């Protein structure tokens, strides 16, 4: 963590998982590229999500510093994968950041995240009349709004034999999403206390390691979201403690919001009175 904050702007948020039916937290870290916001077409964000382990009391575990020292990911390469994605170039394994875990130091002890999802995004403002085929990495705030209901209807028509819509999975059978439908779709835009909030959902074949739906605010990053495949397991998942089966799905219009942003909005609301 110290290396990230020393080299890049990082905005950290805490999401309360209570709406799922389990009291825990998700720590999200937005890492901004050096050229973010400079109108150079190089607005990149890497999102690290430290997800909870419901069967234990901590989402971090101790790690020997020697392991950290010998296996660290070079800071100069962390945005390399998204560069390659943007230009459609093959990605060398040494630039693949997907398996990276965060490490933090508390006093003289090092801790590594148990579950860490890593996603990289290119933030665009492309005024196209039709959605770009962006797969899972372009946050285009200037695309047409496409509600989930529209994609659900289109998906069911194209894959009529599929038992589950990807966001409503009830079985362990997962139908591949047609490439023509894979996208990061804009579902809503709203203003809240001076912030323009863009609501997105990722409809792609990497839902098992992606933030499924999220809210994005320019210069603040991803400030809310849901992690469907981490919390909602298939029917054949072995739940040894019973903690996972107690969880509930969140409605399509509900997100886990950053506690820091909720506090900021509450203060703005209070100042209006």
For each feature predicted by the language model, list its residue ranges.
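Conserved functional acidic sites
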Residues: 1-273
């Amino acid at each position: 963590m110290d290396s990230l904050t020393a080299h890049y702007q990082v905005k950290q948020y805490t999401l309360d998982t209570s709406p799922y039916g389990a009291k825990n937290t998700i720590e999200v870290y937005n890492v901004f590229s050096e050229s973010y916001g400079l109108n150079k077409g190089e607005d990149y964000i890497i999102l690290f999500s430290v997800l909870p382990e419901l069967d234990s009391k901590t989402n971090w575990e101790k790690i020997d510093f020697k392991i950290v020292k010998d296996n660290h990911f070079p800071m100069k390469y962390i945005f390399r994968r998204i560069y390659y994605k943007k230009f459609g170039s093959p990605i060398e394994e040494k630039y693949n950041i997907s398996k990276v875990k965060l490490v933090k130091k508390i006093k003289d002890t090092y801790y590594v995240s148990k579950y860490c999802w890593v996603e990289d995004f290119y933030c665009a403002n492309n005024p196209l009349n039709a959605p770009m085929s962006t797969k899972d990495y372009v946050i285009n705030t200037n695309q047409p709004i496409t509600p989930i209901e529209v994609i659900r209807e289109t998906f069911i028509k194209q894959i009529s034999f599929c038992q589950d819509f990807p966001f409503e999975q009830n079985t362990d059978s997962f139908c591949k999403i047609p490439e023509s439908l894979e996208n990061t779709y804009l579902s809503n835009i709203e203003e809240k206390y001076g912030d323009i909030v863009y609501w997105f959902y990722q409809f792609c074949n990497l839902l098992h390691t992606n933030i499924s739906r999220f809210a994005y605010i320019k210069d603040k990053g991803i400030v809310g979201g849901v992690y469907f495949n981490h919390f909602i397991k298939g029917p054949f998942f072995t739940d040894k403690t019973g903690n996972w089966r107690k969880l509930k799905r969140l409605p399509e219009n509900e997100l886990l919001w950053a506690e820091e942003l909720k506090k900021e909005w509450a203060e703005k609301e209070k100042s209006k009175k």
